[in-house]
Amino acid sequence: MPSEHPFSDGISTPNPKETMNDTAQITASYGRRYIVRTPDGTTYEASTRKKRVDFACGDRVRISPVNAEQVVIEDFLPRQSLLYRQDAWKTKLIAANVTQLLIVTAAVPSPSVRLLQRALLAAEAAGIRAVIVLNKADLPETALWREKLKFYETLGYPVIETRALENAGSLRPALQGHSNILLGQSGMGKSTLTNALLGSQTARTGDISAALDSGKHTTTHARLYDLNGETQLIDSPGLQEFGLHHLQAADLPRYFPDFRHLVGQCRFHNCTHRAEPGCAFKAAAETRAASPERLAFLQGITDELPG
């Protein structure tokens, strides 16, 4: 009798060497351990060769069988996108092949403008559509934060209000047809939103959590879910910082919707947008055609980038 795979919902698993498709998608990542799913829906525990860690949740990969329950990831297939962060010491892959980043914020606990702005820059650099989710919108503390988010709407970033303890219905139309990732600080309600969106699928997360030695729904690693045949959702761990050392200083202005139209308009081609005469960026900030705070943010990010 074929052995029964613990993550296949009770469906028996035939001999993998006879039936396994050699491609799969990573649906959970935890260090160098992964869960992958083949096109026929079968899931396997997966490891990598030579301690490789350059794989991300959402990656489509080539695999080789080890036994009925385990495979080895050989390499990843070409990526549509890669969202990651990098500081002076290390690079952290967040997700691959996503088409939409949903930055989950809330007035409680205290939201980070710094994290929001950095995540938006990373999305712009990766060519990923960004949406801001104002969660816990029914809290009385929300009014001030809602007002601050109006600025980002003027830059072209949609702001969607949700109440995670309800059904997250306001979010569903925006997710449709995208490979989505929820990202934000700890405590903003990402996992609660995920539960609300998944409905009956939520119970399955316990098995994957057990396989990766984590709590039932404490998000310590990224996980991918299918909302329907056209829509995927990745829930990611909470974070407090978003390093941008992978960006090039010369490219930064193009990632600012409020400044990109000024690229090439300064008097000097190597303008640092600080003290040079004829700086279009400074002129825009001085006349309030652009935000002085945003120019200061651009200057600050430029200063911290290597080289």
From Swiss-Prot:
High-level lineage: Bacteria, Pseudomonadati, Pseudomonadota, Betaproteobacteria, Neisseriales
Occurrences of domain CP-type G (ranges): 85-242
Location (main, coarse): cytoplasm
Protein's recorded name: Small ribosomal subunit biogenesis GTPase RsgA
GO molecular function: GTP binding; GTPase activity; metal ion binding; rRNA binding
GO BP, one annotated term: ribosomal small subunit biogenesis
Compartments reported by the entry: Cytoplasm
Residues reported to bind Zn(2+): 266, 271, 273, 279
Ranges where the record places region Disordered: 1-20
Domain of life: Bacteria
Assembly and oligomerization: Monomer. Associates with 30S ribosomal subunit, binds 16S rRNA.
EC code(s) of this entry: 3.6.1.-
HAMAP family cross-referenced by the UniProt entry: GTPase_RsgA
Residue stretches of biased makeup (Polar residues): 10-20
Role this protein plays: One of several proteins that assist in the late maturation steps of the functional core of the 30S ribosomal subunit. Helps release RbfA from mature subunits. May play a role in the assembly of ribosomal proteins into the subunit. Circularly permuted GTPase that catalyzes slow GTP hydrolysis, GTPase activity is stimulated by the 30S ribosomal subunit.
SUPFAM superfamilies listed in its UniProt record: P-loop containing nucleoside triphosphate hydrolases
Keyword annotations: Cytoplasm, GTP-binding, Hydrolase, Metal-binding, Nucleotide-binding, Ribosome biogenesis, RNA-binding, rRNA-binding, Zinc
